[in-house]
Amino acid sequence: MKEGADVPLFRNDMQVIVVFPPAGIGDLTKEALIYQGAFRATDSLGLSFCPIFPSSFKDGVETLVQLVKSDVVGRKRLIIAADYEYSAYLRRAAEEGDVVDSDSTKLLVLDGDLTHPDIYTAYVPFYGTMYKAGYVASKMTDVESVKIYIANSKYRYIREGKEGFIDGFNQNKEGYFDVYDFSTINEDDTEGFYKSTLAYIYDAPECSEFYDMVLPLCGETVMGFLRYSREYPGSFYTVGVTADMSAYSSDVPFSCVEHLDRVLVSCITDWSKERLAHHRTFGMDEGWVELVIPESYSSMLQPVADEIHAQAIKLEGRYEK
């Protein structure tokens, strides 16, 4: 910090508590961005920040419910559930009266499907940016077939990502898409988010032989594909998801970047000023999510992305209604 800069007065009477999934925050993940945003916001505002890493989802849910139910005197708390997996449990808890909105405690969930008067929600839609990505991919002359890996189709942003990409690709030409859902056997299975080693050993070699591009809507599992394409350049293209992944492989022509860190800063700032919206959508029309094309591909792909940008925004608006 520069000499003479204003230092925010630390306020112990306002606390932000973030309950993460059992797997932690990982690399290039939504959880990592949530942590960064929460830390940056609380640090700049002088608020107390308490990250919690439970040993299991059950433990995480119990922690969330206990935090919301427990009343505090002389302190205001914003409790954030940093994983979609918590949504169903929190909805059930709210319906049973275990989650109650109060002046002292607010519960924020990053989920567009969760609606309940006692729960605040924020959501970053994925359809428009993925539509744009699919359209750009269709303009690449060496891309005809795409393997799409899905960690779990019950998550809205994953469904939006898959549908948006396919719709955008087919807008220009008909492509071949092979979709694999890790949760086919058990709809509650979330292991598909954490299979980077298996992706590197088994899935990536298959993709190298049969597919031109991989769209990994599966959290940290993407690291297995990036590692393979880095070690065997030219095997297949990988679409970056959540963060800009072009530094991890020269075969990442573009990334669908979610600025979840900025979303957290916005939500925490609004809460600290007592203006937190009950639900807010952070869309591509305002730059909360965008398609990032690295310099090595920009001369070829950026004009295509610019060409379809307005239509992608319009279609996302229709899709979200």
Predicted regions and their residues:
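Extracytoplasmic "Venus flytrap"
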Residues: F10-R11, V16-G37, A41, I52-V61, ...
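Periplasmic-binding protein-like
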Residues: V18, V73-Y84, L108-L110, S208-G219, ...
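An alpha-beta-alpha
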Residues: A38, Y131-Y176, H278-S298
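Structural motif
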Residues: P51-K69, I185-P205
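Flexible loop/hinge segments that line or gate small-molecule binding clefts
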Residues: V100-V124, A243-D251
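Hydrophobic alpha-helical segments within soluble ligand-binding/sensing domains
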Residues: A122-S145, C256-L276
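Extracellular/periplasmic bilobed ligand-binding domains
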Residues: S196-L260
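Hinge/cleft segment of the Venus flytrap/periplasmic-binding protein
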Residues: S266-K321
